[in-house]
From Swiss-Prot:
Gene this chain is encoded by: Myh14
UniProt source species: Mus musculus
Annotated segments matching region Disordered: 1173-1197, 1260-1311, 1597-1629, 1720-1751, 1910-1942, 1967-2000
Homology family: Belongs to the TRAFAC class myosin-kinesin ATPase superfamily. Myosin family.
Domain (IQ) ranges: 807-836
Regions of compositional bias (Acidic residues) in chain numbering: 1971-1980
UniProt domain Myosin motor: residue ranges: 101-804
Protein name: Myosin-14
Binding, ATP: 194-201
Length: 2000
């Protein structure tokens, strides 16, 4: 047995199976790089330069050559720039050899590192290869363009192929999962993961497309051979519906985002069910977390769901009218426009409708869906406003509400009432509650979101109903997961948390599947394996989100906060920070300015979350009134999707639509939040995925710009790190990814080792080991476990190829044996036939001998006569027997037919029964096993249930105890309440204690209610457990029938049990809490009992006091009556105060009304003023009317002013009266309060004498106290109201003064406007009569004047502001001078204190210096220690990195060593085979060269032969023509013979000669025909040999061309890249050239316009003559205008001079302030100097210390004051500096404004000069006009020439610019030519290659054409030969007939005169017609015509 050899990687490079479209080849196969290891190749360079990868900021990693290598650092030289760097060795990564460039599987790379993986992906991506294998999964990079690799030809290419036989593709992954499902009978799943915009949705669609094509039922498949594209693939109905479900889901669930134009805003899991044969029998779609908030609100540059834009852009006019649609911009919910054009939206909308129809939706359902979509948009158009006096929301315009109600089938009134004033339940009653605007808006948005989400869920259920036809027929399923990718925005919300949580779980599943389960299986199987920890455990982050308790995660905390009524988002964030603050994956915001509330460290990076409205999103509340209306809608769809809202309060039951039919009603009390529902659905999804065999497709985003052909290395590296690509490749290389059971391995591969295992050997493990030994596999390539055998990557694929080869050899041998057997049997049959023929020949020969023998004849005649007599009888008997036999035969035939049918039926029944029996046996065995497992599981569950029941019993007992305790406490409470009621009338203290006790009792009742609720929950959970137990039992019964789904439900039960255990733990925890609460209640009840004992004691004491007080009752009655009178008087005064307060409030309200009226009048006045201004500007011609209107307005203004003054006076009078009234009320209240105080004192003095009515007196006293407090509060309230009134009066006074000021300003503005109006009117009247040119210039002058006026006003205001600031500065300077003098006076008293202060300061400085020195020394030591520690830490980290790197390199080296050993053995074997093949190939090449030369020589010979044959055929043609001529001559002679009988003899002789000549020609033609046939056979033989040789040469030539094509393809790509760059530059230059051409055209147009103006000026000359007189009249007006302009200019100059003077004054003031500031600085310095001198004097006077201690203290205080004053002075100086800087800035601004004014005045002066010049020109033109028309014409011509000169100058300038642009264009063209030359050079090289290819193809075609010509010539020669033969026979026959005629004529001539009959003439003419027809057939005969169609010879003419 030959050993099985393995390749390096265990995987062959994918060959090209079958014909692949040329357009797709470059996107599937990597181009071959010939001569990799040749001289100068990349392999030599890689080996010589020691190429490595080094980090790069731009490219991620950059190629470099290793120059020097040290222990820690190495020197490298960058390959691109040649720059040298020194880097740490751990930053340098090895480079793979060039032969691994663009590897299809990155597990094949010898150097596995980030740089190599990134380089391989980048090279493949730039080559258009987007799919790459990475070990066991596939990596796909989004190309952002359409690729031709998804056609039907590509699908057929991947169909039935193994992974290593075809290039990487998502089709290959799908095919592998599909085949694994069919072979292993295990459910599969394909998980497309990646970030948003990576291409997950598109790959999911391709997977479904492939499965629909491959696994479609036979009835839906096409006939083979019928071509079809992807769009026209014909499927079955179910497959077509499955494909059409995607456009519907994309329309309703996808939207445009910043990262992706077709982003899935929901997750989906598509489950495709297959039967046993592998055909699709159904499908099911599960969706997760639709982003419903996108329907009402979108971020910037993002859009809503596609269906909105498709509906608005694609609906017809009738549909728009039915759905009440409006343009997109009219909807508030659509903030951004559509992402595509209206035409595309229309096409997409029609596609969506067609998909809905394909899936079986009725037209009514489709219309109802679109109606609901339109209604969602109408929700946003409802506008609500706030009422003026209240916060209640109103709907002023209900148009949108009417549209909404019409679409949803609601009543407008009911909808408005339910929205604005919903009914809420308060106690047992329902009340109407007014909603605020914010609450109503929120309710509208919540309803819109809920409506769209419910519509989406209904649509998914409808699709599942159409797809899931027969759920029980599915044997297995294949699931495709497409869920939203990881999202990291600037601020992320609750939706992003759910999406990222899902991706965390999926990545954890990937890590667990790839790294943990894989290694655990190695350990279970006993394989020697060291567990590798890749550090990719994401469980901490998942626990942070989903952990239920200890500590609770984010979702649990969010649910907990949702239960508290006063909880907010802020409290949630605080609780999260408190519970999870120390979690390693949780971070708080480091900066207070951060907008994020917290951050989570996900596997893809840090994500900042903003917890805004998280509680509302989690609870998802709805307006119950509107929801109930929607449930009762008349629209069927609306009522159906809102079916489950009945009974829901506060929270939306989201699960009802997701898990059951739309009409299912949720259980009451089960309030489920969005987070809980999503967590449960995600748990179900993960359980489903964990039960399947997952296949991962990792989608990568190349860039965020969505540009094709661009790859950002950093972005791709981050995604590769997050996805665990390197770890997956490493475990694929180091591990054993392929495994197979012993029995299956033996059954499948025993064919490779036929004699290795003895017969009857049963041990599977030993059998596999014997097979492995026979296969001679390297021990490093496999491991033998306990039940399986494990292989490295690619080994099983190699064994599979060897098995295929072996099976192929066996089949070939079997076919050879079968063909030999058939050939031998045919040969035996031929031999039998030959012997039979010999016998027949012998008998025939004997018969021939006997037939002429007379006795034999006699015997033959006599013998039948002997049996004649018996013959009839025998015949009759035989006839009867024959009839009987025939009847029997027919009967037996019928019986046999019936029996055969019965046998066939029984056979079918037997096979069916056998198959059923076998299936039943299998099912029975499996069911028995399953029943046993279920029985065991049932026992376990029963134990669990009994335990739960016991616990529930304990809980019930506890609840009963609590109930009894509750009753006891209630009785005790009743006793306490009765006792307290008895004591309440006696003492106020007992009343207060009763209130506190009642509060405690209420608290106890609430606690008891909580306990009851918990008890009810426990009972409900118990019932739930019982229901689940019943469900489990029923499911167990069903599971005995359903064999397939047992393994799936097992894990589901385990998950349920784990949930039960969690719930039991929660119940135990709750029970413990209840016990704690019980103990606390017991303690509190004991305390209450003690308190009650104390209260009883107090009550007894009070009763004793009551007995003592009974004697004093009578004396207290009189005093009580007096107190009642005082109280009545106090109440009366209180009522009077309240009346005064009411009057004050009424006055205040009147004041408010008056103020509002004044404000309204002021606004009306302002509006009338604005209207007046507008009317003044609009009516410039009606000056008198405007004057009257202005006077009228002034009168109104004065009247308003008077009215305002009167109102202010009235207001002052009313305020004075109010003050007096209030003061009187205060006096009265003070007197009353004084009386009350006196009454209180009397009552207190006489309190000891009260006996009888103690309780009543105390009650009255308490009422008096409360009334007093109320009076005090009212007094304070009145005082505060009085203050408010005073403040409001001051405000109104201020407002009145402001209104007066505004009126004054308005009057001033009115006056200025009136003056400006009069000026504008005069100017407008004058300017209206001027020429158009003068109008424009004067208009400019007016604008300049207005700007100068505005500038003057602004300057004046700024000057006033500067003056005010200067005054402020003066005051500050005076204050500073005063402060400085005060400081100087106080400074003298500080000298003694300064010495002591200095001494203390010096001592403290010495102490501080010593401490500072110690601190510096300690800091230096700490710094050195820190530095040492950092160095040690860095060294340790460096050593750790080096250790990890060396460990990794050691692992790689170990793997590489094993592979190299295997490679070495393989290469040695291959080398030997290659040497042998090389020798054979060389010999074959030599033989092929010789054959080619020989064939070329033969070809040349054939060409010569063909030419000679052509010439021979031409000669034959000439001979035939000659014969035809002879025929015609003979026919002419025959006619002459018939016409002339005298010349008969001569004709006979001539005919005889002609016959001989024809016979000679016929014999020559026969010889030529035989020669041509011989040559034709030789030519055919040569053609066959030539075809064989040409095929060999063609194959060799195609191989050569393939190599050249690959090299040319690589070169072509480089050229294409350069060409693209050149095209980009060329486009830029084209744009510049287009701009230049546009400018040129513009100039040309302007030139043409100037020419047209020139011609128009000639025509306008006459009009100028006509207007001359008008101009003379207008000249005077122009002079007046010029004079006015001059006067205004003079005024401007005077104003500017005044401004300059003011500016100079300000500058002088600034200088003076600067001098004062300098003087103050000098004074300050002098004061400091004096202070220093005084300090010295204090130091000298230190001897008299004892006497001056008091002075010292005073000086110290003074010194502190001086220091404070000094600080104030410094602050003042700083303020002065600031003021100075502001002044400098203002001076600068004034300077700029002055310069601007000067420029304006200069412009005005230039305008005036221009006007003067124009006037002079007009005067000159007037003189010239007076001189003559000719002079005027010359002036016009001169003016036009000047304009033309200007135009020419402009044109010249434009021409210069055009020349410059032309230079740029020429430069660009030159560069373009260089690029084009370079491209042409490259193209020339490619053309040379192409020419060589075309020459070879032409040579091949020429040879083929020569062969075809030779064949055609041979066929023509054969046809000519046949034709000549036929003609020869015709001529021969005609000659014979002529001879017969001649002989006949001769005989007749001899007998007598010749007489011709009609028959003779007819025969002669028939002969002529026959000859003519022969000629026609000879002329029209085809080369390939059959020679059998010959005309019959005419019969010889016989005499009548």
């Amino acid at each position: 047995m030959a050993a099985v050899t393995m390749s390096v990687s265990g995987r062959k490079v994918a060959s090209r199976p079958g014909p692949v479209p040329e357009a797709a080849q470059s996107f599937l196969y990597a181009p071959r790089t010939p001569n990799v290891g040749g001289p100068g190749g990349p392999q030599v360079e890689w080996t010589a330069r020691r190429m490595v990868w080094v980090p790069s900021e731009l490219h991620g990693f950059e190629a470099a050559a290793l120059r020097d290598e040290g222990e820690e650092e190495a020197e490298v030289e960058l390959a691109e720039s040649g720059r040298r760097l020194r880097l740490p060795r751990d930053q340098i990564q090895r480079m793979n050899p060039p032969k691994f460039s663009k590897a299809e599987d990155m597990a094949e790379l010898t150097c596995l590192n980030e740089a190599s993986v990134l380089h391989n992906l980048r090279e493949r991506y730039y080559s258009g290869l987007i799919y790459t294998y990475s070990g066991l999964f596939c990596v796909v990079i989004n190309p952002y363009k359409q690729l031709p690799i998804y056609t039907e030809a590509i699908v057929e290419m991947y169909r039935g192929k193994k992974r290593h036989e075809v290039p990487p593709h998502v089709y290959a992954v799908t095919e592998g999962a599909y085949r694994s499902m069919l072979q292993d009978r295990e459910d599969q799943s394909i998980l497309c993961t990646g970030e948003s915009g990576a291409g997950k949705t598109e790959n999911t669609k391709k997977v479904i497309q492939y499965l629909a094509h491959v696994a479609s039922s036979p009835k839906g498949r096409k006939e083979p051979g019928v071509p079809a594209s992807v769009s026209t693939m014909s499927y079955g109905e179910l497959e077509r519906q499955l494909l059409q479900a995607n456009p519907i889901l994309e329309a309703f669930g996808n939207a445009k985002t910043v990262k992706n134009d077709n982003s899935s805003r929901f997750g989906k899991f598509i489950r495709i069910n297959f039967d046993i044969a592998g055909y699709i029998v159904g499908a099911n779609i599960e969706t997760y977390l639709l982003e419903k908030s996108r329907a009402i609100r979108q971020a910037k540059d993002e859009c809503s769901f596609h269906i909105f834009y498709q509906l608005l852009g694609g609906a017809g006019e009738q549909l728009k009218a039915d759905l009440l649609l409006e343009p997109c911009s009219h909807y508030r919910f659509l903030t951004n426009g559509p992402s595509s054009s209206p035409g595309q939206e229309r096409e997409l909308f029609q596609e969506t409708l067609e998909s809905l129809r394909v899936l079986g939706l009725l037209p009514e359902e489709i219309t109802a869906m679109l109606r609901t979509v339109s209604a969602v948009l109408q929700f946003g158009n409802i506008v609500l406003k706030k009422e003026r006096n209240t916060d209640q929301a109103t709907m002023p315009d209900n148009t949108a509400a009417q549209k909404l109600c019409r679409l949803l089938g609601l009543g407008v009134t009911d909808f408005s009432r339910a929205l604005l004033t919903p009914r809420i339940k308060v106690g047992r009653d329902y009340v109407q509650k007014a909603q605020t605007k914010e609450q109503a808006d929120f309710a509208l948005e919540a309803l819109a979101k809920a409506t769209y989400e419910r519509l989406f869920r209904w649509l998914v259920l409808r699709l599942n109903r159409a797809l899931d036809r027969s759920p029980r027929q599915g044997a297995s399923f294949l699931g495709i997961l497409d869920i939203a990718g990881f999202e990291i925005f600037q601020l992320n919300s609750f939706e992003q948390l759910c999406i990222n949580y899902t991706n965390e779980k999926l990545q954890q599943l990937f890590n667990h599947t790839m790294f943990v389960l894989e290694q655990e299986e190695y350990q279970r199987e006993g394989i020697p394996w060291t567990f590798l920890d890749f550090g990719l455990d994401l469980q901490p982050c998942i626990d942070l989100i989903e952990r239920p308790a200890n500590p609770p995660g984010l979702l649990a905390l969010l649910d907990e906060e949702c239960w508290f009524p006063k909880a907010t988002d802020k409290s949630f964030v605080e609780k999260v920070a408190q519970e999870q603050g120390s979690h390693p994956k949780f971070q708080r915001p480091r900066n207070l300015r951060d907008q994020a509330d917290f951050s989570v460290l996900h596997y893809a990076g840090k994500v900042d979350y903003k917890a805004s409205e998280w509680l509302m999103k989690n609870m998802d509340p709805l307006n119950d009134n509107v929801a109930a209306l929607l449930h009762q809608s008349t629209d069927r769809l609306t009522a159906e999707i809102w079916k489950d809202v009945e009974g829901i309060v506060g929270l939306e039951q989201v699960s009802s639509l997701g898990d059951g039919p739309p009409g299912g009603r949720p259980r009451r009390g089960m309030f489920r939040t969005v987070g809980q529902l999503y967590k449960e659905s995600l748990s179900r999804l993960m359980a489903t995925l964990s039960n399947t065999n997952p296949s991962f497709v990792r989608c990568i985003v190349p860039n965020h710009e969505k540009r094709a052909g661009k790859l950002e290395p950093r972005l791709v590296l981050d995604q590769l790190r997050c996805n665990g690509v390197l770890e997956g490749i490493r475990i694929c290389r180091q591990g054993f990814p392929n495994r197979i059971l012993f029995q299956e391995f033996r059954q499948r591969y025993e064919i490779l080792t036929p004699n290795a295992i003895p017969k009857g050997f049963m041990d599977g493990k030993q059998a596999c080991e014997k097979m492995i030994q026979a296969l001679e596999l390297d021990p490093n390539l496999y491991r033998v476990g306990q039940s399986k055998i494990f292989f490295r990557a690619g080994v099983l694929a190699q064994l599979e190829e060897e098995r295929d080869l072996k099976v192929t050899d066996i089949i070939v041998s079997f076919q050879a044996a079968a063909r030999g057997y058939l050939a031998r049997r045919a040969f035996q049959r031929r031999q039998q036939q030959q012997s039979a023929l010999r016998v027949m020949q012998r008998n025939c020969a004997a018969y021939l001998k006997l037939r002429n023998w007379q006795w034999w004849r006699l015997f033959i005649k006599v013998k039948p006569l002997l049996q004649v007599t018996r013959q009839d009888e025998v015949l009759q008997a035989r006839a009867q027997e024959l009839q009987k036999v025939q009847e029997l035969q027919q009967q037996s035939a019928r019986e046999v037919g019936e029996l055969q049918g019965r046998v066939a039926q029984l056979e079918e029944e037997r096979t069916r029964l056998a198959e059923q029996l076998r299936a039943e046996a299998e099912l029975c065995s499996e069911a028995e096993e399953t029943r046993a497992r279920l029985a065991a599981r049932k026992q376990e569950l029963e134990l669990v249930v009994t335990e739960l029941e016991a616990r529930v019993g304990e809980e019930e007992e506890c609840s009963r105890q609590l109930q009894s305790e509750k009753k006891r406490l209630q009785q005790h409470i009743q006793e306490l309440e009765s006792h307290l009621e008895a004591e309440e009338g006696a003492r106020q203290k007992l009343q207060l204690e009763k209130v506190t006790t009642e509060a405690k009792m209420k608290k106890f009742e609430e606690d008891l209610l909580l306990l009851e609720d918990q008890n009810s929950k426990l009972s409900k959970e118990r019932r739930l457990l019982e229901e689940r137990l019943a469900e489990f039992s029923s499911q167990a019964a069903e599971e005995e029938e359903k064999v397939k789904s047992l393994n799936k439900l097992r894990l589901k039960y385990e998950a349920t049990i784990s949930d039960m255990e969690d719930r039991l733990k929660k119940e135990e925890k709750g029970r413990q809490e209840l016990e704690k609460l019980k103990r606390r209640l017991d303690g509190e009840s004991s305390e209450l009992q003690e308190q009650m004992v104390e209260q009883k004691q107090r009550a007894e004491e009070l009763l004793a006091q009551l007995g003592r007080k009974e004697d004093e009752l009578q004396a207290a009655l009189l005093r009580a009556e007096e107190e009642g009178g005082a109280r009545a008087q106090l109440l009366k005064s209180l009522r009077e105060a309240q009346a005064g307060l009411a009057e004050a409030q009424e006055d205040l309200e009147a004041e408010r009304v008056a103020r509002a009226k004044a404000e309204k009048q002021r606004r009306d006045l302002g509006e009338e003023l604005e209207a007046l201004r507008g009317e003044l500007e609009d009516t410039l011609d009606s000056t008198n009317a405007q004057q009257e209107l202005r006077s009228k307005r002034e009168q109104e203004v004065t009247e308003l002013k008077k009215a305002l003054e009167e109102e202010s006076r009235a207001h002052e009078v009313s305020m004075q009266e109010l003050r007096q009234r209030h003061s009187q009320a205060l006096v009265e209240m003070a007197e009353q309060l004084e009386q009350a105080r006196r009454g209180k004192g009397v009552w207190e003095k006489t309190r000891l004498s009260l006996e009888a009515e103690v309780s009543e007196l105390k009650a009255e006293l308490s009422s008096l106290q409360t009334s007093r407090q109320e009076g005090e509060q009212k007094r304070r309230r009145l005082e505060s109201q009085l203050q408010e009134v005073q403040g409001r009066s001051s405000d109104s006074e201020r407002a009145r003064s402001e209104a007066a000021e505004k009126l004054q300003r308005a009057q001033a503005e009115l006056e200025s406007v009136s003056t400006a109006l009069s000026e504008a009117e005069s100017k407008a009247i004058r300017l209206g009569k001027e020429l158009s040119s003068a109008e424009s210039q004067l208009h400019d002058t007016q604008e300049l004047l207005q700007e100068e006026t505005r500038a003057k006003l602004a300057l004046g205001s700024r000057v006033r502001a500067l003056e005010a600031e200067a005054a402020g500065l003066r005051e500050q300077m005076e204050e500073e001078v005063v402060a400085r003098e005060r400081a100087g006076r106080e400074l003298q008293s500080t000298q003694a204190q300064l010495s002591e202060w200095r001494r203390r300061q010096e001592e403290e400085a010495a102490v501080l210096e010593a401490g500072e020195e110690a601190r510096r020394r300690a800091a230096r030591e700490a710094e050195t220690l820190t530095q040492r520690l950092a160095e040690k830490t860095e060294a340790v980290e460096r050593l750790e990195r080096a250790r990890r790197r060396l460990q990794q390199e050691l692992d790689d080296a170990t793997v590489d060593l094993g592979q190299q050993k295997q490679l070495l053995s393989t290469l040695e074997k291959k080398q030997r085979k290659f040497d042998q093949l090389l020798a054979e190939e060389k010999a074959a090449v030599l033989r092929a060269v010789e054959d080619r030369e020989r064939i070329e020589a033969e070809g040349r010979e054939r060409e010569a032969r063909a030419l000679s044959l052509t010439r021979a055929l031409e000669e034959e043609q000439e001979a035939r023509e000659e014969l035809e001529r002879q025929n015609r001559a003979l026919r002419a002679e025959l006619e002459a013979l018939l016409s002339s009988k005298d010349d008969v003899g001569k004709n006979v002789h001539e005919l005889e000669r002609a016959r001989k000549a024809a016979e000679q020609a016929a014999s020559d033609l026969r010889t030529q025909v035989t020669e041509l046939e011989d040559e034709l056979t030789a030519a055919e033989d040569a053609k066959l040999r030539l075809e064989v040789t040409v095929q060999a040469l063609k194959a060799q030539h195609e191989r050569d061309l393939q190599g050249r094509d690959d090299a040319g393809e690589e070169r072509r790509r480089q050229l294409a890249k350069q060409l693209r760059d050149a095209e980009v530059e060329r486009d830029e230059e084209r744009k510049q050239r287009a701009l230049a051409m546009a400018a040129r055209k513009k100039l040309e147009l302007e030139l043409e316009e100037l020419k047209a103006q020139t011609s128009a000026a000639g025509q306008g000359k006459e009009e100028a003559v006509k207007q001359l007189k008008k101009m003379q009249v207008q000249m005077k007006e122009l002079w007046r205008e010029v004079e006015e302009t001059r006067s205004s200019r003079d005024e401007m100059f005077t104003l500017s001079r005044e401004n300059e003077k003011k500016l100079k004054g300000l500058e002088a003031e600034v200088l003076r302030l600067q001098e004062e500031l300098a003087a103050s600085d000098r004074a300050r310095r002098q004061a400091q100097q004096d202070r220093d001198e005084m300090a010295e004097e204090v130091a000298s006077g230190n001897l008299s210390k004892a006497a001056t201690l008091e002075e010292k203290r005073q000086l110290e205080g003074r010194l502190s004051q001086l220091e404070e004053e000094l600080e104030e002075e410094q602050n003042n100086s700083e303020l002065l500096k600031d003021h100075y800087r502001k002044l400098v800035l203002q001076v600068e601004s004034l300077t700029t404004e002055l310069s601007a004014e000067r420029s304006f005045s200069a412009k005005a002066e230039s305008g005036r000069q221009q006007l003067e010049r124009q006037i002079q020109e007009l005067r000159a033109r007037l003189g010239e006009e007076d001189a003559g028309a000719r002079a005027r014409q010359k002036m016009l011509i001169a003016a036009l020439e000047s304009k033309l000169a200007q135009a020419e100058e402009q044109l010249e300038q434009e021409s210069r610019e055009r020349i410059l642009s032309g230079k740029l264009v020429r430069r660009a063209e030159k560069r373009l030519k260089e690029v084009v030359l370079q491209v042409d050079e490259e193209r020339r090289v490619a053309d040379q290659v192409r020419d060589q290819l075309e020459k070879s193809n032409l040579r091949l075609k020429q040879l083929k054409r020569q062969l075809e010509e030779a064949e055609e010539e041979a066929s023509r020669a054969q046809a000519g030969r046949r034709r000549l033969q036929r003609e020869l026979e015709d001529v021969t026959e005609s000659a014979e007939s002529m001879n017969r005629e001649v002989t006949t004529l001769r005989n007749r001539l001899r007998r007598g005169p010749l007489t011709f009959t009609t028959r003779t003439v007819r025969q002669v003419f028939r002969l002529e017609e026959g000859v003519a027809s022969d000629e026609e057939e000879a002329e029209g005969a085809e080369p390939g015509s059959a020679p059998g169609q010959e005309p019959e010879a005419p019969p010889p003419a016989t005499p009548q």
